[in-house]
Amino acid sequence: MKLKTMTMEWTGDELILIDQRKIPLKEEYMSCKTYKEVALAIKEMVVRGAPAIGASAAFGYVLGAREKFVEDFEAFVEKMREVKEVLANTRPTAVNLFWALNRMENALRKYGKVEGVLEFLENEALNIAKEDIEVNMAIGRYGAQLLKDGDTVLTHCNAGALATVDYGTALGVIRAAVEQGKRIKVFADETRPYLQGARLTAWELMKDGIDVTLISDNMSGWAMKLGKINAVIVGADRVASNGDVANKIGTYMVAVLAKRHGIPFYVAAPTSTIDLNTQTGKDIPIEERKHTEVTHCGGTQIAPDNVKVFNPAFDVTNAELITAIITEKGIVYPPYEENLKKLFEE
């Protein structure tokens, strides 16, 4: 039972992740043979993007099950709580992490016996990964309807194949539109401080032969004013029940600018990223990362010694700034409080 994509490879014995910290200068890989190695890869952003984190955690759970296996089922379940906790404590904002781990834990409890349990859990993790690819392609098909031939789309961060198991959410929409024969151009903003737009989105799109122009973060408003942008499409790390969206820091700024210039602002996200238990964006925990991500660039210090740093990894975009949320079940328009719930009633 194997899986191989641009982002990850499951060999049956280990999880191999492309090291996204090294792209585009190098294509290196990290081999994870234990659940703690998977946890480290998530925490250190070897792998990033909510769906990719969720799938990686599921495979981490499988590796943990092999390490913790005992013949007594209840004792095994108890040991797996520790595995889940270690994986869950890596990054707090992306809800797919907790969704995937809860799904694995619930599947284990429902299975209810130790005979064949390791193979069962491996199959469940593979299902999570394969479903993610199918979901992303469905998001792409729905979202492509919103783009016209000749449109230029602004993206923020990386919500492509690298952020998922494959194909991508925001970039999946662009890929699908291009596959339909539409001539789509992309403006990718660099996305400081981790430069996911410059390093990852530009790299991905160039590999696919999609027309991409890189801009710095402070150019997006001017590009909009000049009429160079027809739509904005971003991904999401968590969507609250009222439609507020947590995504990579800088998303809120882009949404405000899009609103000012009358440009549609779309969020592409699977239903696994929608958290109906989170009422509003105020309830979403925002991860803060180390100060060196801001004070250093490419290993070179660019700020004074001992300067104070504020480095939230995410921000929250208010629902009223979002034109629509594109999911694998269709396009959701306001009022989000009502229409997001309908996705889970069908």
Swiss-Prot record:
GO terms for biological process: L-methionine salvage from methylthioadenosine. It catalyses: 5-(methylsulfanyl)-alpha-D-ribose 1-phosphate = 5-(methylsulfanyl)-D-ribulose 1-phosphate. The keyword Isomerase applies. Its EC number is 5.3.1.23. It comes from the Bacteria. The keyword Amino-acid biosynthesis applies. InterPro entries: IF-2B-related, IF-M1Pi, IF_2B-like_C, Initiation_fac_2B_a/b/d, M1Pi_N, NagB/RpiA_transferase-like. The record marks 157 as: Transition state stabilizer. Keywords: Amino-acid biosynthesis, Isomerase, Methionine biosynthesis. Pathway: Amino-acid biosynthesis; L-methionine biosynthesis via salvage pathway; L-methionine from S-methyl-5-thio-alpha-D-ribose 1-phosphate: step 1/6. Catalyzes the interconversion of methylthioribose-1-phosphate (MTR-1-P) into methylthioribulose-1-phosphate (MTRu-1-P). This is Methylthioribose-1-phosphate isomerase. It comes from Thermosipho melanesiensis (strain DSM 12029 / CIP 104789 / BI429). The gene is mtnA.
